Amino acid sequence: MINLIRRFLWRLLGIDYSHILRVIDFKYLKEDAFKSIGNKSYDNGAIVYRWSDAPITIGKYCSISYDVKFVVDDGKHRYNTVTSYPFKSNQISAKRGIEIGNDVWIGLGSTILYGVKIGDGATIAAGSVVTKDVEPYTVVGGVPAKLIKEKCTREEAKLMQEIAWWNWGEEVIESRVNDFRLSYADYIQKY
């Protein structure tokens, strides 16, 4: 009875209560309708939280560990107004989305927030909360995620992106798989 009265009052006041009553606001990445996943990328049960059709774009050869969460928009909550409570049902989530480059590894239990772009070759340490863009060929970690180290020099990172091995055909990649164990300098010199 209390729930009926509560819903009646919320309707009378013009408050959208549907989001409060929902039990599930997420989908598994594999089931998400607004995702684009590149060749050979995989996940182990990543979850997408969304309240809009903001896209998730994942490049080729990405490894996404178990319990990774993608929060693709702000869920109608504002941080720069008097209250963050979503009073009006006509509030629209700011569509931000998430963009992940190629050859990215996202560690166990990490959370990637809306508006973030993760560069090619980046590594996200387990348990990180990524709130800002991640440069190519860097390792970030923590809450919020911060630079831990660069995997190679900035010049080498640019050259690796020019080589773009992830765009080679599968047969070419398979024939060169042992070269992936080379140092960045040796690999760049070879290709």
Label the model's feature ranges.
Residues I124, G142:
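Conserved G/P- and acidic residue-centered "switch" motifs that form tight phosphate/ATP-binding loops
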Residues F8, D32, F87-I112, P144-Y191:
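C-terminal segments of enzyme domains that contribute to small-molecule binding surfaces
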Residues D25, S36, Y42-V116, V143-P144:
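Flexible, glycine/small-residue-enriched loop-and-beta-strand segment within the central core
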Residues M1-L29:
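Membrane-proximal basic amphipathic "stem/tether" segments
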Residues G119, T131-G141, E150:
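Short conserved catalytic/interaction loops centered on acidic-Pro-aromatic/His motifs
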Residues L108-A122, S128-K132:
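Beta-rich strand-turn-strand
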Residues D73, T81, D133, I148-E150, ...:
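Residues that scaffold the ATP/ADP-binding catalytic core of kinase and kinase-like folds
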